[in-house]
Amino acid sequence: MQVVSITGASSFIGTHLLERLSLCNDLHLRLLVNRNPNLFLQESEKVSIIRGNLLDTKTLNSLVETGCIVINLAYLSSKSKQENLEVIHNLALACREVGVARLVHCSTAVVVGNSRDNVITEDTICQPLTEYEKTKLEIENVLINSLKGKTEVIIIRPTAVFGRQGRNLIKVADDLISLTPFITSLKTALFYKRRLNLVCVENVVSAILFLMQINDRMDGERFIISDDDERENNYYDTINLLASHFGHKPVKAFYMPYRYHILRMMLTASKRSNVNAHRNYSSKKLFDLGFKKSIQFNEGVRRFGSWYNKSLLHN
């Protein structure tokens, strides 16, 4: 039985991943959790729960074993760059020492930083601007360089992941519910067809599972997963998809001259890395391997809208 060890199992992506993995009968899951895990899976013959701290080398050593597959979803957002790099160095060392077969590391597509390219691929030169982007890129490089020739490392770079219990799209939905129709139209006129670079969490999970199971050796390869191939993945169409699901009237956007120039200046002033309203992230490299998404963008937005509505009713 294949052993799969997971860090960040109680995270947003981790929760959705466990739902899919729980349906697999030929896997033994080893889950690293904190003291109060929010997991729907209980310890059993096929599920081992390791309680501990990512900064503790003993915890990491107890998580991995020879020949296992590691899925790393963890990032310590409240910790410093140095502490996050310490975790990664310790994880890499643990993988080397026991002989982990493959490590699938979940990074982020925004490591590309403030590139001016309209289409971002895995070959786009990264120009990270924020500390988060720089840390995430350095983590990728540490894993690849530390485990080269020892453990196969595959990096997955999702764009803005949304879905049930996720934070992306919350602001758009909140604005639709709370702002006046005029302010909503004004904001929509400004953002209009600006690409949102969203990706359904279901598709991120499918990509992780695909790369976990692929037979070809992909050591050191990076893969973007995005729903930017979907035309509606922009502000105007997405807010109207949500409006439809909420039973609201369509949001209209009046003409605003030089809207994207104004938006670029606003985003630049707020020190955002991506000020390009037309940026798309390409998943062609992943698709060329035979990967198929599990859900279309419109359906993902519908599911998010349904969860959001239920959340409002419970609050």
Language model regions located:
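N-terminal Rossmann NAD(P)H-binding glycine-rich loop of SDR-like oxidoreductase domains
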Residues: 3-24
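Conserved Rossmann-fold NAD(P)-dependent oxidoreductase catalytic core, especially the SDR/UDP-sugar
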Residues: 89-132, 154
